[in-house]
Amino acid sequence: MPREHFENHDFLDKQEILSYEELTLVVESLVPLGLAKVRLTGGEPLLRRDVCDFIKMLPQELDIAMTTNGLLLEKYAHDLALSGLNRVTVSLDAIDIETFQAMGDTKDTPETVLRGIETARKAGLSVKVNCVVRAGYNEHSVEKITERFIGTDVVVRFIEFMDVGRTNGWTLGEVIPS
């Protein structure tokens, strides 16, 4: 989230994407060189078929984490924990439905993400929440998100809106510096 539109972008053909076996080989070859952590990111890693099987393939002495938008977390949290995932970071920029849907360009609701976070906690996963704060969009969400997770073991991090090229409509005026 949000939906990104990449006109005229040449995506890799499926056969050019590394298989889980190839990714595991790369990870295993880096462990003797000091690799201690692996983070699965996206797009959305929970859209990847059989992601739990991939996690099981990774050396279990690693700290294995995932960053997700949280929309599928309720469905997969238990299996993720059983497969060896240690931590999950959930992107959540608002908990009021209007801001959540506008910022994410989605019809989904923040309640879906909040249920996923709670399911992940109950499954034994360590949970962090990242909230990207944008002036004129969701600065009012800082207090609401803080209140929602105060007194829980969920770590909340507020992040500056960053320039990542031409895909997110970044403007300096939307940055609230930390």
Enumerate the language-model features and the residues they cover:
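Short, small-residue-rich loop/turn micro-motifs
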Residues: 1-5, 92-94, 160
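Canonical Radical SAM [4Fe-4S] cluster-binding loop centered on the CxxxCxxC motif
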Residues: 1-18
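A short, flexible beta-alpha/helix-coil linker loop
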Residues: 6-11, 95-97, 163-165
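Short, solvent-exposed loop/turn segments at secondary-structure junctions
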Residues: 7-8, 48-49, 74, 165-166
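Short, solvent-exposed loop/turn segments at secondary-structure boundaries
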Residues: 13-14, 101-105, 168-172
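Radical SAM/AdoMet-radical enzyme domain recognition
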Residues: 17-39, 47-149
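Conserved G/P- and acidic residue-centered "switch" motifs that form tight phosphate/ATP-binding loops
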Residues: 44
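Flexible glycine/acidic-rich beta-alpha junction loops that bind and position SAM and/or redox cofactors
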Residues: 136-137, 157-178
